[in-house]
Regions:
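Single conserved hydrophobic/aromatic residue that forms the stacking wall/gate
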Residues: 111-121
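Conserved loop->alpha-helix
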Residues: 1-113
Length: 121
């Protein structure tokens, strides 16, 4: 589970096409990987991914074709950076709202409207 609060922002992303989908490597700070373990969950742009391996300033993930079809992870690069979040730990303040990061489908935005003159209560 995640809180939806971005903890890290990375513009250094390497992608390698694989038969199963994509190998993703994201540069992070040492602070972000402190206490991280192989198999931990990290949200990348809100998508729950499993840590394949990591170094103090680099995390590696495998992303399968289905996840690439339903998310924007295939579009990540230095021009489309990633928002990152570590999974919640029992007893930590949530500070946002509970988010699973498990993607079931995608939607198409049909229109937007300017809400500048609207009040919400």
């Amino acid at each position: 589970m995640f809180s939806g609060i971005v903890q890290e922002y990375s513009k250094s992303i390497l992608k390698e096409i694989k038969p199963y989908g994509l190998s993703l490597s994201i540069k992070v700070t040492k602070k972000f990987t402190k206490g991280l373990k192989k198999g931990d969950s990290v949200a990348v742009n809100g998508v729950c991914l499993t840590v394949k391996k990591f170094k103090p300033e680099q995390i590696y993930f495998d992303v399968i074709h289905e996840s690439l079809k339903l998310t924007n992870l295939n579009n990540l690069d230095s021009k489309a950076p990633a928002n990152l979040e570590r999974s919640l730990r029992l007893g930590e303040e949530i500070g946002g709202h509970l988010v699973s990061g498990h993607i079931h489908t995608k939607a198409c935005l049909l229109y937007t409207s300017d809400a500048a003159d609207e009040l919400r209560s």
